Amino acid sequence: MADELAAFPRPWWLVGGWAIEAATGFRHQHEDTDISILACDVPAFVAHMSGRWHVWSNAGGMLRPLGEQWTTVDEPRSQLWVRANATAPWVLNVLLTPDRARLWTNKLLPDHVAPVSEVTRAGADGIRYLQPEIVLLYKARLRRPKDDPDFDATLPLLSRQQRQRLRTALTAVVPDHPWHGRL
């Protein structure tokens, strides 16, 4: 799948646990592979994967195949699921990121708009990853115990500016989150 994505001519980046692992080296079991693309790039993504992969839209649990008949999604905050064929397991979860004029827009804080290059970083492998403080914000809203080790591994590596951005975002999104006391 990495080769397929490397040839995709639009921005994409790894998110979730893979982004935390790339930032920290902290390894854990991954349930799936999550990437993100700008919602405006869905037609290009569907065209790129066409003929080799089945791409489905998952909007609120409603699945719909994307291809010649449907090339776009109705909800720019939804997901795409990718698999090799109709009976194969899903191999990729594509989280759609709303955009404004091709600028990344935070799903939780819509006033946070930035170029993709500012909210992602290139790893040693050449792959782009969502900045760890943004990943932690998304994880914080879910309040899952499995995300605490990611926070523990990431916190010492965050710069003062990254900590401040996370603190400000947490205050707006999850003001009573227990991570506040450690930032």
Across the structure, where does each feature detected by a protein language model lie?
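Compositionally biased terminal segments of proteins
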Residues: 1-183
